[in-house]
């Protein structure tokens, strides 16, 4: 099953996350199908903090992909 989740990047104590569509059997930071955006929790500017390709996420969800809890919360905040 395809799941849309966060993949951790960045260095120690400076996390940066990519929002990716991947198979749920793959490791968190492993191979993914498509990159759908990013989330930078450390950034102060809102424009550099989060970016989500909502059209692509909607496409994956229509094909049966599930959202992780954290991505679901981020998507809700991004739409506001």
Curated annotation (Swiss-Prot):
Classification via Pfam families: Ribosomal_S16 (PF00886)
Similarity section: Belongs to the bacterial ribosomal protein bS16 family.
Gene Ontology cellular component terms for the protein in this record: cytoplasm; small ribosomal subunit
UniProt protein name: Small ribosomal subunit protein bS16
Listed GO biological process terms: translation
Biological source species: Wigglesworthia glossinidia brevipalpis
Alphabetic keyword roster: Ribonucleoprotein, Ribosomal protein
Paired cysteines (S-S): none
GO MF annotation, one: structural constituent of ribosome
